[in-house]
């Protein structure tokens, strides 16, 4: 049952990308990205990553809501275009949805969904002793590994976000 839930969430995840690729107005693009981010968090939660799913949901979607609220206020239209207002956009949207649904039907024709990716490297991390408590959280160990082994990744990510914010502020500043 859980495999089918992840499969359905994955279908909706890809359909949201189709909706983003054929967005007629920036308002709908932001909305579809927020929906796809929430569905991605649900997929992570379904695989047991409760802390990671919650953090992505709070930080990523919270930041996106602020950014898209700001950009919507800056570039709002009185009558925004919708998917049915332009025939080419509607045709691209329907073609994308049909191709995704046909792919899903092809996968489900055998009456069984199987995991395509095998996670062979799951035991590669060194596990530290937890002491007398006996409690071990994989997510806490992953975050510890990110900050200990991936220090440069965290630094580069922080600088990239800072540069991105400065560029966006400069572009939207105007004359």
Curated annotation (Swiss-Prot):
Concerning its family, UniProt says: Belongs to the complex I subunit 6 family.
Establish whether keyword Lipid metabolism is in the entry.
no
**Subunit and partners:** Core subunit of respiratory chain NADH dehydrogenase (Complex I) which is composed of 45 different subunits.
Q: How is this protein situated with respect to the membrane?
A: Multi-pass membrane protein
Q: What class of enzyme is it?
A: translocase
Q: Molecular function terms in GO for this entry?
A: NADH dehydrogenase (ubiquinone) activity
Instruction: Write down the InterPro entries for this protein, in alphabetical order.
Output: ComplexI_Subunit6, NADH_UbQ/plastoQ_OxRdtase_su6, Nuo/plastoQ_OxRdtase_6_NuoJ
The UniProt function text for this chain reads: Core subunit of the mitochondrial membrane respiratory chain NADH dehydrogenase (Complex I) which catalyzes electron transfer from NADH through the respiratory chain, using ubiquinone as an electron acceptor. Essential for the catalytic activity and assembly of complex I.
The UniProt gene name for this protein comes to MT-ND6
Mitochondrion is among the record's keywords: yes
Known catalytic reactions: a ubiquinone + NADH + 5 H(+)(in) = a ubiquinol + NAD(+) + 4 H(+)(out)
* Signal peptide (residue range): none
The record lists the membrane-crossing segments as: 1-21, 25-45, 47-67, 88-108, 149-169
Protein name, UniProt field: NADH-ubiquinone oxidoreductase chain 6
GO biological-process terms attached to the record: mitochondrial electron transport, NADH to ubiquinone; mitochondrial respiratory chain complex I assembly
Where is this protein found?
Mitochondrion inner membrane
This protein's UniProt keywords = Electron transport, Membrane, Mitochondrion, Mitochondrion inner membrane, NAD, Respiratory chain, Translocase, Transmembrane, Transmembrane helix, Transport, Ubiquinone
> What cellular-component terms does GO give this entry?
mitochondrial inner membrane; mitochondrion
Taxonomy, top ranks, is: Eukaryota, Metazoa, Chordata, Craniata, Vertebrata
Q: Report the Pfam families cross-referenced here.
A: Oxidored_q3
EC number of this enzyme: 7.1.1.2
């Amino acid at each position: 049952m859980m495999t089918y839930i992840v499969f359905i969430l994955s279908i909706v995840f890809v359909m949201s990308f189709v909706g983003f690729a054929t967005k007629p107005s920036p308002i709908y693009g932001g909305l579809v990205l927020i929906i796809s981010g929430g569905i991605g968090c649900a997929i992570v939660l379904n695989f047991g990553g409760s802390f990671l799913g919650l953090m992505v949901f709070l930080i990523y979607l919270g930041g996106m809501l602020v950014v898209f609220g700001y950009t919507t206020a800056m570039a709002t239209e009185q009558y925004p275009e919708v998917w049915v207002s332009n025939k080419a956009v509607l045709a691209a949207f329907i073609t994308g949805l049909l191709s995704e649904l046909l792919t899903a039907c092809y996968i489900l024709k055998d009456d069984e969904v199987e995991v395509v990716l095998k996670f062979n490297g799951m035991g590669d991390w060194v596990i530290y002793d937890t002491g007398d408590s006996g409690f071990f959280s994989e997510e806490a160990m992953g975050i510890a590994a990110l900050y200990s082994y991936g220090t440069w990744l965290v630094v580069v990510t922080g600088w990239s976000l800072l540069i991105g914010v400065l560029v966006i502020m400069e572009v939207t500043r105007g004359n």
